[in-house]
């Protein structure tokens, strides 16, 4: 389950205090099904989950294929017609639902990132950074879809009773760069209660000795390969959380062996297990490329784990270097190793944890405030 899904799921109960809610998705995860069942929220889904396109030709048809699935979800049309407000969280296939929403209904789009498969090359690289196919040809094949994406976002922005927010200052700047639009800022959130370790399990991690944690589906964009490379000669192992394609995990295993880095690819973990693994780690690390916000730093703050991250993207919104964690230049290997050594120091860990919690408070990243911010967007749309 990705960070965006975790953020959405943790906010649903708090949104229900502001709105009577229904939830629609093309591919529900078990955690979403569970919370909807527990809280008696209507969950509108297709009979068969929509599969995310992976090759360039399928990506071109992404909008059309997902729209057909949205149209066939039983009860969705009626739910839309009866809505006072619709909040869309961007993701694969989500944008096409806009075509089904009458102009009379206020809509807010939380644009977590511009479509990276269309506007960047990083998603078209193998886990080791090599192109999956000729990048020039890929760019050419996707040119039509790229133009359509820009037009769709601009048309939505000009629609009456519509609003767009990015999830970080970095994302807001990327939206301006790609779509030439000035948009709002809606931070993600954190529920500190999710990171209280209920029961320790020392045998959970299948590694000996100290380790760092890297979260995110194994890929080049998440920096998995580079994280392993960085750990060479540190005597630190890696716990990777997020899974990946078998072919990619096999390549990463071979790479790890060549770097003499032990890696444990964790199975799907419960929230408590995730908290345990993070709590017992040397640090939470990431060399992700252009991460739009990245929930993992604030999750590290919440659990008291040092956050050591690449000095790029949305990580710079939450981490203040040497105050509540470290921001390291991608290729500065010496600084990475020094930071991981710092993360072992008890006093530094305590300081970064304290300052990290202060950062969460300063940005007001509580779920209650997230729901309040969305409610204010709704009020602005109906009164504007």
Predicted regions and their residues:
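Aromatic "clamp/platform" in nucleotide-sugar-dependent glycosyltransferases that forms part
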Residues: 289
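Conserved acidic donor-binding segment of nucleotide-sugar-dependent glycosyltransferases
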Residues: 321-322, 326-334, 340-347
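A conserved mid-protein helix/loop that constitutes part of the nucleotide-sugar donor-binding site
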Residues: 6-10, 210, 217-233
């Amino acid at each position: 389950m990705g960070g965006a899904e975790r953020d959405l799921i943790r906010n649903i109960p708090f949104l229900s205090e502001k709105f009577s809610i229904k939830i629609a998705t093309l591919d529900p995860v078990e955690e979403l099904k569970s919370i909807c069942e527990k809280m008696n929220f209507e969950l509108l889904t297709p009979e068969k989950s929509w599969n995310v396109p992976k090759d360039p030709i399928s990506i071109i048809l992404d909008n059309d294929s997902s729209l057909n699935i949205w149209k066939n979800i039983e009860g969705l049309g009626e739910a839309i017609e009866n809505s006072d407000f619709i909040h869309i969280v961007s993701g694969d296939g989500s944008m096409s639902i806009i075509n089904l929403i009458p102009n009379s209904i206020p809509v807010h789009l939380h644009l977590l990132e511009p479509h990276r498969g269309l506007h960047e090359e990083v998603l078209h690289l193998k886990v080791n950074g090599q192109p999956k196919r000729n990048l020039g040809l890929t760019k050419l094949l996707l040119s039509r879809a790229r133009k359509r994406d820009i037009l769709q976002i601009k048309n939505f922005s000009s629609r009456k009773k519509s609003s767009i927010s990015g999830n970080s200052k970095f994302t807001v700047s990327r939206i301006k760069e790609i779509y030439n639009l000035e948009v709002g800022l809606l931070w993600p959130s954190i529920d500190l209660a999710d990171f209280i370790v209920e029961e320790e399990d020392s045998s959970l991690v299948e590694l000996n000795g100290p380790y760092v944690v890297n979260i995110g589906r194994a890929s080049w964009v998440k920096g998995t390969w580079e994280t392993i490379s960085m750990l060479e000669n540190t005597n630190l192992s890696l716990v990777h959380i997020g899974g990946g394609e078998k072919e990619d995990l096999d390549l990463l295993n071979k790479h790890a062996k060549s770097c003499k880095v032990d890696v444990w690819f964790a199975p799907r973990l419960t929230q408590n297990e995730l908290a345990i693994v993070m709590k017992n780690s040397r640090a939470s690390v990431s060399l992700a490329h252009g991460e739009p916000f990245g929930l993992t730093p604030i999750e590290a703050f919440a659990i008291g784990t040092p956050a050591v991250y690449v000095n790029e993207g949305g990580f710079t919104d939450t981490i203040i270097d040497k105050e509540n964690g470290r921001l390291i230049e991608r290729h500065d290997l010496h600084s990475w190793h020094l930071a991981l050594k710092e993360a072992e120091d008890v006093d530094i860990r305590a300081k970064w944890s304290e300052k990290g919690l202060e950062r969460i408070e300063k940005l007001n990243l509580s779920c209650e405030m997230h729901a309040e911010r969305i409610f204010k967007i709704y009020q602005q749309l109906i009164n504007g």
